[in-house]
Amino acid sequence: MAQYEFQTEVSQLLTLIIHSLYSHKEIFLRELISNASDALDKLKYEALVDGTYKQLHCEARIDIAFEEDAQRLVVRDTGIGMNAEDLRANLGTIARSGTKAFLSTLTRDQKQDSNLIGQFGVGFYSAFMVASKVEVITKKAAENTVWKWTSEGQNAYTLDEVDAAAFPVLEGVAEGSAGTCVVLHLSQENSEFATRWRLEEVIKKYSDHIAFPIYLHYLQKEYDKDGAVTDTQKKVDQVNDAGALWKRPKSELKEEDYHRFYQTLTRDSTPPLLYVHTKAEGTQEYVTLFYVPAKAPFDLFHADYKPGVKLFVKRVFITDDEKELLPVYLRFVRGVIDSEDLPLNVSREILQQNRVLAAIKSASVKKLLGEFKRLAECDGKKYDEFITQYNRPLKEGLYSDYEHREQLLELVRFRTLSESVPEDGWTSFAEYVSRMKPDQKAIYYIAGNDDRVLRQSPHAESYRLQGFEVLVMSDDIDGIVMPSVSKYKEWELRAINRLGSEEELRPNEETDAAAQREQGFKPLLERLTHILSDSVKEVRLSKRLSDSVSCIVIDENDPTVQMERLMRATGQTHKSKIKPILEINASHTLVQKLKESTDEAFVEDLAFVLLDQALLIEGMDVGSSVDFVKRVNRLLARG
């Protein structure tokens, strides 16, 4: 008998599951049935693409049996099965980053955490919530060896080669069938899970729409008038519906049907925000059923995110790991695509080049974006919930999906400096346009990483004073995405921290006086440009500033701060740093002092301090924090 230690994360996981989710124990059966369904799907797919499996003939089914007196529960599938290597990889160690994420995501809310178990792919271990010992007897398809994995949920497990007789005999399951049998030795307090009524209740609740039949084996007893058992018969009943819900007409389905199927599909017990059920007929025949989860998937912004859409061909499962079924920015969508026109033996390479699938993808994107628009028009409160979760991915689409950019521009939302909108309220481009000043030529925005800082930005001072609304874009990708979006309908989009965006601003004085002032400041501007030449392109007077003394402006053709950081991180930028422009407020006391001073040391110190504080407000690095502090101290000492 070979004994192995669990990987550290498995031990932590077992402890957390057993002690954190005790009031939602029934979910263990949901997880075991879902795993069985996955195993059946995998075998079905392998039989299509791998000649090794094509000769195997076995009814795809899930069987559940129990022994009430012995407090034993059996969950058996005729799926792909496992060998010793699979058992060690899948049940002894946890190689996926999702499990570590699960451990860090536990909320102490038992209902929410019981939902997370399945989404993070660690559902098997929930069996230890109800069992003092778990045995896994399994035979991989196309192999002859039977293996037995055993653990009491502590720190170790055993793994042995066993005889085929180790599989429990179940009516309807062909002898010698591949697949996996999970045997749970229930603890005393969980004896309810060795009763027919409780098992039927849980299966109906969570697994009614599993695509394979689930059979419950039980003993039907007959009693006499005194309550004595007079006859016992073995019975096998199919408990679940086992239909492809997406194939049924929408007129036959209720909202609760869609919600139950969503739970089965995603193991998410929270109802989805919306679902979209489409049947296409004509040159191409396919059905799609898409869901938008109420909460964003945990791996939404992981590079190795798991796709949420399953592909079927004529109801035969093909893959749930294909990222090309929908655009990357719609990776939060869950659901199924079932095509009548794709070949059953379709490979991943064929999928990526297939015209049928490309057409389904394009139509699905249009349908989903149309549903999002309908939601925005019909239920603003619900759309706000949607945007709170998925605004950022939709913005990614503005950058990557030119074909649907116009639709996406109507869907994305932003915060705003408008006093008519609460600070935590959303506004659309269309709503912004409806509030624009007469003859206003552009839509103005400011982008950065901190909403609070952006709201106090010096760049917005004159815009606010002169009645120009400014959109606040504080997602980390806004500074990368928005420069690629030049227009919304006929209005240009202008970042107020970019040179040229100030064209519509009125100068603080008459034109002649402004020109005269500019001329009067010319020597100072040239002087400051020379002092700061290693750090800035130019120092100029500002039309944007009314109260603040200085601000940093990006030249018209230079990348934003966010884009420059991305370029630097990916090695795409030149060694020489891109220099910004420093704007100063001619009306500010400090600038007046600069103009009047003949003290070169004072002018140099104050010039660098004005630059550094403008950089700090932008969230940019100052050249040297030590030099900055020394300069501030020297200026303070002057009084």
Curated annotation (Swiss-Prot):
UniProt cross-references to PROSITE patterns, sorted A to Z: HSP90
Keyword terms: ATP-binding, Chaperone, Cytoplasm, Nucleotide-binding, Stress response
Chain residue ranges for the region called B: 349-565
Top-rank lineage group of the source organism: Bacteria
InterPro entries noted in UniProt: HATPase_C_sf (IPR036890), Heat_shock_protein_90_CS (IPR019805), HSP90_C (IPR037196), Hsp90_fam (IPR001404), Hsp90_N (IPR020575), Ribosomal_Su5_D2-typ_SF (IPR020568)
A GO CC annotation given for this chain: cytoplasm
Coiled-coil intervals, chain numbering: none
Positions of the UniProt region annotated as C: 566-639
Region (A): 1-348
Cellular localisation: Cytoplasm
GO MF entries: ATP binding; ATP hydrolysis activity; ATP-dependent protein folding chaperone; unfolded protein binding
Keyword check for Transferase: no
Record SMART domains: HATPase_c
Quaternary data: Homodimer.
Biological function: Molecular chaperone. Has ATPase activity.
Similarity comment: Belongs to the heat shock protein 90 family.
Protein name stated in the entry: Chaperone protein HtpG
Naturally occurring in which organism (per UniProt): Treponema pallidum (strain Nichols)
Gene behind this protein: htpG
